[in-house]
C-alpha cells in the first residue's frame, strides 16, 4: 500500500525552461503498524519562482505531509533547462541544504526526459 502511494508522487517536477534552483527530497511512506521497514523514494523539484531552495522545500514538504508522508531535503543545486535544444544541466549547491547528489537527480531527470541530453557537474553555484 505504501509503495503504491509513493508511486503516485511524480519523481520529477521542474520548470520547462530557464535556469532555476532545485532540491532533491527523500519521501518516507508511513509503514504499516508493526512493520519496521519504511518505503522511500527520492524526488526532484525545481522552479523559477523560488528565490531560495528553502522556498521549494517548504512548499513541497507541506504538500507531501498533507498526503500523509514525511520527507527531508537531501540537498540542492541549480538546473539549466533548454527545452528548444533538449538539454538539461544540473550543477551547483544550496547554501542552506548543501549539494544534492546530482548523479541521483540526473538519473531521475533522464527517466522523465529520455530524449534529452542530461548532464551534471559539481562545480558552479
Curated annotation (Swiss-Prot):
An example GO BP is: positive regulation of cell motility
- UniProt-recorded Gene Ontology molecular function terms: actin filament binding; calcium channel inhibitor activity; protein histidine phosphatase activity; transmembrane transporter binding
**Quaternary structure?**
Monomer.
Q: What positions are modified (N-acetylalanine)?
A: 2
| Reactions catalysed according to its record | N(pros)-phospho-L-histidyl-[protein] + H2O = L-histidyl-[protein] + phosphate; N(tele)-phospho-L-histidyl-[protein] + H2O = L-histidyl-[protein] + phosphate
Q: Which Pfam families match?
A: Ocnus (PF05005)
EC top class named in words: hydrolase
Q: What is this protein called?
A: 14 kDa phosphohistidine phosphatase
Question: Where is this protein localized, as stated in its record?
Answer: Cytoplasm
InterPro entries the record matches: Janus, Janus_sf
GO cellular component entries:
cytosol; leading edge of lamellipodium; nuclear body; plasma membrane
Q: What does this protein do?
A: Exhibits phosphohistidine phosphatase activity.
Annotated family: Belongs to the janus family.
Residue sites binding substrate per the record: 21, 94-96
Q: What is its EC number?
A: 3.9.1.3
Active-site residues (renumbered): 53
Which keywords accompany this UniProt record? Answer: Acetylation, Cytoplasm, Hydrolase, Protein phosphatase
Amino acid at each position: 500500500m505504501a509503495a503504491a502511494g509513493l508511486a503516485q508522487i511524480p519523481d520529477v517536477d521542474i520548470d520547462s525552461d530557464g535556469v532555476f534552483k532545485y532540491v532533491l527530497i527523500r519521501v518516507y511512506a508511513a509503514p504499516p503498524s508493526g512493520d519496521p521497514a519504511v518505503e522511500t523514494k527520492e524526488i526532484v523539484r525545481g522552479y523559477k519562482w523560488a528565490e531560495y531552495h528553502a522556498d521549494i522545500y517548504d512548499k513541497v514538504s507541506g504538500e507531501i505531509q498533507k498526503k500523509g508522508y514525511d520527507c527531508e531535503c537531501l540537498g540542492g543545486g541549480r538546473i539549466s533547462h533548454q527545452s528548444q535544444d533538449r538539454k538539461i544541466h544540473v550543477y551547483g549547491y544550496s547554501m542552506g541544504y548543501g549539494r544534492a547528489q546530482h548523479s541521483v537527480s540526473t538519473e531521475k531527470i533522464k527517466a522523465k526526459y529520455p530524449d534529452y541530453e542530461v548532464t551534471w557537474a559539481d562545480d558552479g553555484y
